[in-house]
Amino acid sequence: MADGSSLLFRLHLEGVDIGSRADDQAKAWRKHSDDFVSLFYDGHHCFTSLLAGDRAANEKLLDNMREFIAGDRKGWNKEVTAKVGVPLVEGITAFADGDYDKSVDLLQPIMSDVLTMIPVKKKSWN
């Protein structure tokens, strides 16, 4: 799902009319709004929901992330969701809303963490 979502987002950023193609992707992501398996996937879920115009799914993802980090779980996933995941989703959302200053303010401090999550970037280091 991540590859399809990424392609749609890149095409959208290039000005290509993707029509309703993001709708099916967003629908598939909705099933994973509380998985917290990977921030890489959470980011894709976020921008695909926004591309499809599904603000409710994006807000649910963000609410679930906040609930996850507020809970009594311990460990790396909770810490990285708090440090990187929530700002990542908030930053993507701000970008989609056209609030570029806010997007930069949220994303700039976590960029080095975000870059370590990108599989293509990891492959290019080898």
Residue ranges of model-derived segments:
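Long, internal scaffold/assembly segments composed of regular secondary structure
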Residues: 1-31
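"A position-specific structural signal for the A-helix of alpha-solenoid helical repeats
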Residues: 3-10, 43-44, 48-51, 84-92, ...
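Structural motif corresponding to the intra-repeat A-B loop/turn of tetratricopeptide repeats
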Residues: 11-14, 52, 97
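TPR-repeat structural position
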Residues: 16-19, 55, 100
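Solenoid-like repeat scaffolds
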Residues: 25-39, 63-80, 108-120
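Non-catalytic interaction/regulatory modules that flank or connect domains
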Residues: 38-41, 49-61
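Long, positively charged binding patches that form subdomain-scale interaction surfaces
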Residues: 55-58, 65-68, 80-88, 95-97
